[in-house]
């Protein structure tokens, strides 16, 4: 099946960050086979021609760190620091989860993400009360591209920890798929919730299965102080000593890093999922993304969960990410719009090991989203496309979402998930949680 999308303004995110006015994209099945300017007059015979009527077309956004199973916890535990928030609000509520509630919560998060322009994401879920196969089936049904990882903790007895490692290894062997729509990573929660032995076992599983690693790291000053007091090393050095960085690793946050750590992480291909809104809301601080990029680190933007954000809008994350860097460095050139867009598209895709997506180029997967600026005053005049995408647009502006060549959202309607049912069930299950 060959489909041509014509009469579009195409934000390619190629090496030149080229914007093509009055362009077209030809998709064959799941791949882009042509991106060009002007009237459609290709040598390719196509089955369908769709007039985009001047819409902006850009790569699908890539959320490098989230927790969609937590979506029912939106608005719970506001105005709290990370540790008490986790210990007194989030973990007690997660302990009440059932398989049915977890699926309902996941569906809500998926619906919000895909309708706001996210096409790919990397996720960590707490396995308590969760049917992991049902979660993976739900993500698959959404049509989204994802790395969904089972989180490991050292809670309970040594026997509990041993069982958690065994279950996580089975999960990795079952779901790791380097080139498929769904894959996974090895995901120890953090150095403050995992024993040394568990972290070493996670490193072993990642090496033996050639997977990536996903971990929360250097998120707060308290974490750095506590780990240094307990192990005599800062979190980066401690986790490295456990062997985790033998495989490409995504660290969520990286708020509290020094220059030596940034250089070390870049050398060891450790990437950062930058969660600006979550870090601000939890009072964790502001990650120095400018310094990370200057050190050669790969960085991708992320939302974290709705419980600490409180939405999954990647446009909002792009905007706050660039504004924060300009503010903390008192440098208006810090993190310009092209860089912010890169960190939410092709740069983010590289961070989570999905190089097949993130830009609109021949050979890439057909993952793209559209915005119609013609009826949106906040996107007018419509000629400064890149600026408007970062500083003015929001997830509510999305018209269409195509993932792997399939129309997942069309004219604002999600074709893969039942929006009315999902919203009804979310409210019903939320009422059942004992707060």
From Swiss-Prot:
Top-level taxonomy: Bacteria, Bacillati, Bacillota, Bacilli, Bacillales
Required co-factors: Zn(2+)
Pfam families according to UniProt: Amidohydro_1
Role, per record: Catalyzes the deamination of 5-methylthioadenosine and S-adenosyl-L-homocysteine into 5-methylthioinosine and S-inosyl-L-homocysteine, respectively. Is also able to deaminate adenosine.
One Gene Ontology MF term: S-adenosylhomocysteine deaminase activity
Coiled-coil regions listed: none
Keyword flag Transferase: no
Organism field: Bacillus anthracis
EC code: 3.5.4.28, 3.5.4.31
CDD domains per UniProt: ATZ_TRZ_like
Family label: Belongs to the metallo-dependent hydrolases superfamily. MTA/SAH deaminase family.
Cofactor note: Binds 1 zinc ion per subunit.
Gene: mtaD
Catalyzed reactions per annotation: S-adenosyl-L-homocysteine + H2O + H(+) = S-inosyl-L-homocysteine + NH4(+); S-methyl-5'-thioadenosine + H2O + H(+) = S-methyl-5'-thioinosine + NH4(+)
Enzyme class, spelled out: hydrolase
Residues binding substrate, per UniProt: 94, 150, 189, 219, 304
The protein's name in its UniProt record: 5-methylthioadenosine/S-adenosylhomocysteine deaminase
Binding locations of Zn(2+): 65, 67, 216, 304
SUPFAM superfamilies assigned: Composite domain of metallo-dependent hydrolases, Metallo-dependent hydrolases
Record-linked Gene3D superfamilies: Metal-dependent hydrolases, Urease, subunit C, domain 1
Keywords: Hydrolase, Metal-binding, Zinc
Keyword Cell wall biogenesis/degradation applies: no
């Amino acid at each position: 099946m060959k489909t041509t999308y014509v009469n579009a303004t195409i934000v390619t995110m190629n090496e030149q960050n080229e914007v093509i006015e009055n362009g077209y994209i030809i998709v064959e099945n799941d791949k882009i086979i042509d991106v060009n300017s002007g009237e459609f007059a290709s040598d390719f015979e196509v089955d369908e021609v769709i007039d985009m009527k001047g819409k902006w077309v850009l790569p699908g956004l890539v959320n490098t760190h989230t927790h969609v199973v937590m979506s029912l916890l939106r608005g719970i535990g506001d105005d709290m620091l990370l540790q008490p928030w986790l210990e007194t609000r989030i973990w007690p509520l997660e302990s009440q989860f059932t398989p049915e509630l977890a699926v309902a919560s996941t569906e809500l998060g998926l619906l919000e993400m895909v309708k706001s322009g996210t096409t790919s994401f990397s996720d960590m879920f707490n396995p308590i009360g969760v049917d992991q196969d049902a979660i993976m089936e739900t993500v698959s049904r959404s049509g989204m591209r994802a790395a969904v990882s089972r989180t490991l903790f050292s809670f309970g007895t040594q026997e509990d920890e041993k069982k958690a490692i065994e279950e996580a290894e089975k999960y990795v062997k079952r779901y790791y798929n380097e080139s498929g729509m769904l894959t996974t990573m090895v995901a120890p929660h953090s150095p403050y919730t995992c024993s040394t032995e568990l972290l070493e076992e996670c490193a072993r599983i990642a090496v033996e299965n050639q997977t990536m690693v996903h971990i929360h790291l250097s998120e707060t000053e308290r974490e750095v102080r506590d780990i240094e007091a307990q192990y005599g090393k800062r979190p980066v050095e401690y986790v490295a000593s456990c062997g985790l960085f033998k495989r490409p690793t995504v660290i969520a946050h990286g708020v509290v890093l020094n220059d030596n750590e940034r250089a070390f992480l870049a050398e060891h291909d450790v990437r950062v999922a930058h969660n600006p809104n979550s870090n601000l809301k939890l009072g964790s601080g502001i990650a120095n993304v400018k310094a990370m990029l200057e050190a050669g680190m790969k960085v991708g933007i992320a939302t974290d969960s709705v419980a600490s954000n409180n939405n999954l809008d990647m446009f909002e994350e792009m905007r706050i990410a660039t504004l924060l860097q300009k503010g903390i460095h008192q440098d208006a050139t810090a993190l310009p719009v092209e860089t912010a867009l890169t960190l939410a598209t092709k740069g983010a895709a590289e961070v989570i090991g999905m190089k097949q997506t993130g830009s609109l180029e021949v050979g890439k997967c057909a993952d793209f989203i559209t915005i119609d600026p013609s009826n949106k005053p906040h996107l007018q005049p419509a000629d400064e496309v890149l600026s408007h995408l970062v500083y003015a647009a929001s997830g509510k502006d999305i018209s269409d979402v195509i993932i792997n060549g399939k129309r997942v959202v069309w004219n604002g309607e999600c074709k893969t998930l039942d929006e009315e049912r999902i919203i009804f069930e979310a409210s019903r299950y939320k009422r059942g949680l004992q707060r």
